Amino acid sequence: MLIMSNINITESTIALIDSLKSTTGAFGLAGTGSEYKIVTELFLYKFFNDKFGFEAKHDKIYGPRLCQSEKWDAEYDSFTEEEVEDLFSYLPSSVPRMKPEHTLSHLYNASGKGDFSTLLDATLEDIATLNADTFAVTTSGKSRVNIFTKVTTYITDVQKRDEFAKALMRNIASFNFEDVFTEKYDFFSHIFEYLLKGFNNAGGGKYAEYYTPRAIAQVMARLLVGDNANLRGITCYDPSAGTGTLLMALAHQIGEDRCSIFSQDLSEKSSEMLRLNLILNNLS
């Protein structure tokens, strides 16, 4: 496989975000509070799909079987329930779990059937439940907020929901995240900043209230950490983390494998973006 340059990867990822926003705009959701939820959820669903496939293909037990197939997800469809659970047991805890019926290929192939919007929403909720222990956010009241919710119900005209769901599938089907999984903080922080900027005024709120620009966060992290390259077992806690940019910069400066980060925030919007930021940087 030809590995794209960093510039091409960045441009393609930004184009994915823009295509999703184009679809939400075409269905009358541009600038609404629901737009950022739809775009970030579909962006993250595609990330989950490709991350799971990437890690599954590198598994020592099942990887060779998946790699020998022209399309890994087609081969994955043939797995028994026992084989699926066995594969899950070998994957790192940070890797999202997806059953064969959750994959993009499976969904895309079903998009021509009736009531596809219901299938898409049910699939997202099923993935959220399956991965709740790893990716759900816990509120101060100890309630869990799952990573995915229904997205097509934001379209008030029920007759247009299937069309909307199919358009979202077309947006994400042509992109592949696999080329970016070897990238680190510098790449993902730029993508996250672009994604965040697009929803700065979404739903009447301003993410700028919760956001430290990446350049400033990097300077702050360098000042806090200094040139100490021997830090180990460091704990970083931000009680008002916003979207987590400073925490990401600190983890990068210290070393992602040499620190643990903890965060919270009062804002539901910023907490959702914080979770996305953590997942993209493999720090969930």
Residue ranges and their predicted role:
Residues 206-284:
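Conserved S-adenosyl-L-methionine
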Residues 1-224:
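Non-catalytic, mostly N-terminal accessory regions of nucleic-acid modification and defense proteins
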